[in-house]
Design a protein with these regions (language model features):
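Non-catalytic C-terminal interaction segments of nucleic acid-processing enzymes
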Residues: 1-27, 34, 109-173
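Active-site beta-strand-loop-beta-strand hairpin of nuclease catalytic cores
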Residues: 50-69
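Catalytic cores of nucleic-acid endonucleases
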Residues: 67, 73-122
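Anionic group-transfer/hydrolysis microenvironments
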Residues: 30, 59, 73
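Short loop/edge segments at beta-strand edges and connector loops
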Residues: 27-29, 100
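Intrinsically disordered, low-complexity Ser/Thr- and acidic-rich flexible linkers and loops
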Residues: 35-49
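Short, flexible, glycine/charge-rich loop motifs used to bind or transfer phosphoryl groups or to couple energy/partner
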Residues: 14, 48-49, 59-60, 84-89, ...
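Acidic/glycine-enriched edge-of-secondary-structure segments
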Residues: 40-44, 66-73
Length: 173
């Protein structure tokens, strides 16, 4: 029997994989999370700047303040549907990865854009505690035009991560 993995399981694997190399890791980060900067040249006295241009399944900030995005795909149809969306995975994202289970890798690996990396969830029944492990199959090519985020954006990402944590904890009751 083939073991399958869920999106929440993938989220935890990604968290564990990038935990030591990240300042913060936030699931389901929306493009609506903008930062306001004081700007007296604007009519309202501020300007608003989006952190990302689309929703990210996982957004992490590296220890050098660069953004890293991971798109989770647990089926081939889910993977192919991503290419029908109107957005791309560029902007100020330094590294972009697809995270997929081992059982769809052969069907999608040739469809992955050149700059995107691939993380693969592998199942090993012989492991005592965690049967699923995430391994890097292909390294992401760094986006050379990406710049480190500033303190305001980093604080906003921390805040969104904090709010999401408590939102989900309250729902567990």
């Amino acid at each position: 029997m083939k073991e399958t993995i869920t999106t929440p399981q993938m989220e935890l694997l990604i968290y564990k994989y990038f935990e030591k190399s990240s300042l913060v890791i936030v699931p389901k980060f929306s493009r609506l999370n903008a930062v306001r900067y004081d700007d007296n040249t604007k009519r309202l006295g501020y300007r608003s700047e989006n952190i990302v241009t689309h929703e990210c399944d996982i957004l992490s900030v590296t220890k050098n303040n660069f953004l890293r995005e991971v798109e989770i795909k647990v089926s081939v149809s889910d993977f192919k549907a991503d290419f029908k969306k109107k957005h791309n995975h560029e902007g100020n994202i330094k590294q972009f990865y697809y995270a997929v289970p081992y059982y769809i890798l052969d069907k999608i690996k040739d469809l992955v854009p050149e700059q995107a990396g691939i993380l693969v969830a592998e199942y090993n029944a012989e492991l005592l505690s965690e049967h699923w492990q995430l391994k890097r199959y292909k390294k992401a090519i760094d986006n050379k035009s990406a710049t480190p985020i500033d303190e305001e954006k980093l604080n906003k990402i921390f805040r969104i991560g904090y709010l999401k944590y408590w939102f989900y904890r309250k729902r567990e009751k």
